[in-house]
A protein has these predicted regions:
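Membrane-embedded glycan transfer/ligation machinery
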Residues: 64
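Active-site scaffold of zinc-dependent metalloenzymes
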Residues: 13-61, 73-77
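Short, flexible coil/linker elements and helix-boundary hinge sites characteristic
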Residues: 31, 59, 80-82, 109, ...
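Catalytic Zn2+-binding segment of zinc metalloproteases
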Residues: 70-87
Length: 117
C-alpha cells in the first residue's frame, strides 16, 4: 500500500491518495466495512482540531474511477464547508473538481513510476 498526502489550498484539509493491490488491506487499516469488492473508495476522517482528511483509495485506477471518486471528494468538501452546489454558477465546483482529479491522477501515476502532467 502506497500513501501520499496532499495539502488542500483554500478549503483546508488534506487529500490522502492510497494505491493498493488489495482493498481489504485498506479496509483493515481504516476499519471500513463492505469495501472488499470495491475498485475504489472515498472516506473522511477528522483530526483532533476538526481538520478534515479526505481519503481516496484505489485498487483500480482507471480514469473513470478517478473521476467517480473525485465527485465524492468534492461533495464532501462542499458539505463540510456548508457550500451548496449551484448549477448556474458552477465554476468553483469545476475548478475544484479539476484540481482534485489532477492531484489524484499525478499521485497514482507517480506511484507507478510515471511522471505525467
Amino acid at each position: 500500500m502506497k500513501i501520499e498526502k496532499i495539502k488542500l489550498p483554500i478549503y483546508h484539509g488534506t487529500l490522502i491518495v492510497i494505491k493498493t493491490k488489495k482493498m481489504s488491506k485498506v479496509a483493515a487499516k481504516y476499519d471500513l466495512k463492505n469495501c472488499d469488492d470495491c475498485d475504489a473508495i472515498t472516506f473522511v476522517r477528522s483530526n483532533k482540531k476538526g481538520i478534515k482528511k479526505y481519503f481516496v483509495a484505489f485498487e483500480n485506477a482507471k480514469p473513470s474511477i478517478i473521476a467517480h471518486e473525485t465527485v465524492h471528494v468534492v461533495n464532501y468538501i462542499y458539505q463540510h464547508h456548508c457550500i451548496e452546489l449551484d448549477r448556474f454558477n458552477d465554476e468553483p465546483q469545476a475548478y475544484l473538481t479539476g484540481f482534485i482529479f489532477d492531484e489524484i491522477y499525478k499521485s497514482l501515476n507517480k506511484k507507478n513510476g510515471n511522471k505525467q502532467q
